């Protein structure tokens, strides 16, 4: 494996950023962690990966706005935007491409995007090897039911990527034991601008639709944390449990 040089001794990490609540708090948390551990600013590279999904334009817009505010501005590198198209792999009628998002009460298992994390990590790891970044931080939470979000998966991917790239690279999932409401509480402590985060599969003018299952997940987490979600909604359910 190729090691970091003396001049690159400070931490150099990539953080996958989707513009959503979890990745925003993850980025802020990494800034905080490294500022405490280091005497000088670490290289923290936020990365957004486009795959051709219908919600991505709104995600990018929100991410760019968010990074212009504390606690991010002046603390991270400019957003790196990579492309990893999946439109030639998924059927043309797939809901993630058409914008026909799963309904509010859809089970989490039904929104699994096959191969999503495999493709993301493959693309981002090549970027990391080229740019001498030594860690990728990702944001799955406790209870994530998908096979490409388990500790075993991340360990296996880490080994394969290090071997294939001949580059020392760690994959970390710091929030793997946290619930979404716990992530919200951490984000409050870190002054994350939740009003600019977007966790929606069918945004309307860069606002949450309030009708998809990602909006349900977000609204219910804020409700369990006894907080109002400050982000804008095209439709905001009065009851987060029913979506009405």
Predicted feature residues:
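Local cysteine-cluster metal-coordination motifs and their immediate loop/turn environment
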Residues: 122, 198-220
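Charge-dense, low-complexity polyampholytic segments
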Residues: 136, 201-207, 227-235
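Amphipathic, positively biased hydrophobic alpha-helical segments used for protein targeting
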Residues: 30-31, 35, 135, 198, ...
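Short Fe-S-cluster ligation motifs
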Residues: 216-244
């Amino acid at each position: 494996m190729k090691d970091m040089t003396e001049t690159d001794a400070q931490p150099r990490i990539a953080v996958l950023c989707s513009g959503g609540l979890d990745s925003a708090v993850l980025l802020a948390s990494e800034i905080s962690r490294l500022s405490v551990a280091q005497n000088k600013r670490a290289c923290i590279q936020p990365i957004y990966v486009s795959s051709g999904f219908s919600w991505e334009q709104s995600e990018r817009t929100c991410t760019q706005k968010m990074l212009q505010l504390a606690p991010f501005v002046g603390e991270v590198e400019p957003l790196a935007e990579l492309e990893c198209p999946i439109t030639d792999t998924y059927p043309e009628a797939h809901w993630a491409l058409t914008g026909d998002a799963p309904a509010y009460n859809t089970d989490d298992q039904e929104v699994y995007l096959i191969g999503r994390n495999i493709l993301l990590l493959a693309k981002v790891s090549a970027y990391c090897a080229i740019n001498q970044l030594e860690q990728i931080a990702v944001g799955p939470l406790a209870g994530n039911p998908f096979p490409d979000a388990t500790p075993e998966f991340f360990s296996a991917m880490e080994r394969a990527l290090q071997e294939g790239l001949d580059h020392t690279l760690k994959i970390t999932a710091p929030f793997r034991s946290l619930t979404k409401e716990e992530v919200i509480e951490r984000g409050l402590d870190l002054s994350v601008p939740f009003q600019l985060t977007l966790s929606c599969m069918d945004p309307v003018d860069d606002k949450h639709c309030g009708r998809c299952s990602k909006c349900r997940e977000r609204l219910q987490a804020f409700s369990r944390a006894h907080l109002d979600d400050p982000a804008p909604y095209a439709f905001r359910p009065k009851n987060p449990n029913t979506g009405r």
